[in-house]
C-alpha cells in the first residue's frame, strides 16, 4: 500500500490515509519544488511554471501528480462578500454574466482568494438562448423564465442555429483574458448545457419540480422534441469549439435534468446527443477534456461512461469508490463532497475531504463538490476546504 500524507493547519498532527496504488502515466513536465513551514509542519508545494500544463489537465490524463486538483462548482457566487458587493452595483444577473469585464472580475474572485486548480467562466447554461431566438430572463428569487415556450414543430422551426461569435462575443473575450490572467497556474474551464437539460428549461418555461411539459412532449410528440434536441446539439458543438478556441482548456457539460429520465428514456433523449457532441468535438479538438455532470446520476453511471467524455462528475449520492468501479478506470472522476458539508465544523469538512480522496484513489481524480456551493455557505469554510485540499500529498 502507498501512503497519502495530509498536513493541515487545523490538525495538531499529520493524518495518514492509505490509498491503493493504481497505474499512472509518467509525467514529462518539469516543476520546481518549494518547501515551506506551516505552523511547524513542512509542506511541500509544487510550483508549476507558466509553460507547463496545469495540474488539473495532467491529472485528467492520468499523469503522476502530487495531489488531486481542486475547484468547486459555483466557486464564484453569492457566498462571497466580494460578489455580494458587486451584485449591489449590478443587480441583474444577465448584466453581470454578459459583460466581459464583469465576467472576468467575477471568475477571478475565487482565484485571487483560494487559488483553485480550475477557474471556471462565470456564465449560465442558458446564455446561448437569446442567440437562438429563444427570449429569456433570469429573475432574482424566481430563476430562469422562458418567454413563449415552444410547443409545436412550427415553434421549434423558429429556433435558430447558434453563432457564438455574433451572439456572445463577450464569452470569447472573457476566456481569452482569463487565460492571460491565470497564466497556466490553473486550468481555465468553460461550460455548456446538455441538449436535454436545455430543452427541459425551454419547454417547461423555466425550472420545474415535476417536468410534466417536457415529458408530455417526449411521449406524445417525440419527433418535435428530437428536432429541438438536435438543434441544441449542433449549437453546443459549435459553442464548445468556440470556448476552446477562445481559451478554455476543458469544458464541463451540465445535464442536470437528465436524471429525471428513466434509463430507457435517457438512452433515447439524452445519450445519443451527448455522444454526438463528444464525437464531433473530439474530431476538431481531440485533446480537449470534456467533463459531464448530471445531478443524481447513480442510476445512470454506466450510461454516462458510454458518452465518451473524459471525466464524469459524481454527486454525493454515489459512493466515490463504487462510482469509480462502475465507471471503469479509463475515465477520470470529479467530486463528490456534499455541498452541505461546508456548513459543518472545520474538523468535519477535513474528514470528508480525506474520505473522498481516499476512496477516489491516486490518479484521475478532480476534488470537487457533488453540486454547487450553496447560498449562505460560510466563506471561511470554503477557504478551509481549499487549504486542506491543497496540502494533501499522495
UniProtKB/Swiss-Prot annotation:
Q: Where is this site: Transition state stabilizer?
A: 124
**Its family?**
Belongs to the uroporphyrinogen decarboxylase family.
Please tell me whether the keyword Plastid is annotated for this protein.
yes
Domain of life assignment? Eukaryota
Its annotated pathway reads: Porphyrin-containing compound metabolism; protoporphyrin-IX biosynthesis; coproporphyrinogen-III from 5-aminolevulinate: step 4/4; Porphyrin-containing compound metabolism; chlorophyll biosynthesis
Q: What is this protein called?
A: Uroporphyrinogen decarboxylase 2, chloroplastic
Q: Does the keyword Ribonucleoprotein apply?
A: no
- In terms of one coarse class, where is the protein primarily found? plastid
What PROSITE patterns does this protein map onto? Answer: UROD_1, UROD_2
Q: Name one GO molecular function term.
A: uroporphyrinogen decarboxylase activity
Enumerate the subcellular locations listed in this protein's record, separating them with semicolons. Answer: Plastid, Chloroplast
Reactions that this protein is recorded to catalyse: uroporphyrinogen III + 4 H(+) = coproporphyrinogen III + 4 CO2
What is the recorded function of this protein according to its Swiss-Prot or TrEMBL entry? Catalyzes the decarboxylation of four acetate groups of uroporphyrinogen-III to yield coproporphyrinogen-III.
| Pfam families found in the cross-reference section | URO-D (PF01208)
Q: How does it assemble?
A: Homodimer.
Q: Where are the transmembrane segments?
A: none
Instruction: Enumerate the Gene Ontology biological process terms.
Output: chlorophyll biosynthetic process; protoporphyrinogen IX biosynthetic process
Q: Which UniProt keywords apply?
A: Chlorophyll biosynthesis, Chloroplast, Decarboxylase, Lyase, Plastid, Porphyrin biosynthesis, Transit peptide
Q: Which residues bind substrate?
A: 74-78, 93, 123-124, 201, 256, 371
Q: Matching HAMAP family, A to Z?
A: URO_D
* GO-annotated cellular components: chloroplast; chloroplast envelope; chloroplast stroma; Golgi apparatus
Q: Which organism is it from?
A: Arabidopsis thaliana
Alphabetical list of PANTHER family matching this protein: METHYLTETRAHYDROFOLATE:HOMOCYSTEINE METHYLTRANSFERASE RELATED, UROPORPHYRINOGEN DECARBOXYLASE
Top EC group? lyase
